[in-house]
Amino acid sequence: MRIRKATEEDITAITELAEKIWWPTYRNIISEEQISFMLKDMYSEESLKKQLVSGVDFILAEKENLAVAFAGFSLIEPEVYKLHKLYVLPSEQGNGTGKNLIEYITDLAREQGGKILELNVNRGNSASEFYKKVGFEIYRTVDISYHHFILNDYIMRKNL
């Protein structure tokens, strides 16, 4: 397993991963309409390039030179980093890939003076249990209006 910072050249791979991961992850949690909208709004190549330019660092996990997982994070306030996204192919889940990505990002955030790593996770997403196992705790429960959808999330935090 190789974990590295992604570049603009990796945007297509991240878009393809999102398409493969979002449907099985969210099909029983949110509507197909919302999945399609979110993929287009947040994971199109254009959107990912804008995120990269705005300061989001993307991380890619590769196995045998194939992208199997990705994450994105950035500084959102002094000493607080936001894990905007972390997705692992279903075939790779349970193999330590997500944990390795969290450790990689934790190290990068610490090196840059981070004290807290924060994330949002849908309250119906079983990933919240994974995040608890790697040291996150529920900080708040929120309902966020996003275009014509409501995001029912936990905000989780981990001290670095």
Q: Where are the model-predicted features located?
A:
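Extreme N-terminal starter segment of soluble prokaryotic enzymes
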Residues: 1-3
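Acetyl-CoA-dependent GNAT
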Residues: 5-11, 15-91, 102-104, 108, ...
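Active-site acidic-Proline motif in GNAT/NAT acetyltransferases
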Residues: 89-95, 123
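Short coil/turn segments at alpha/beta junctions that flank glycine-rich nucleotide-binding fingerprints
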Residues: 95, 112-115
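Short glycine-rich hinge loops at helix-strand junctions in the catalytic core
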Residues: 96, 135
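Residues forming the Rossmann-fold NAD(P)(H) cofactor-binding site
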Residues: 99
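C-terminal "cap" of GNAT-fold acetyltransferases
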Residues: 115-128, 132-134, 142-160
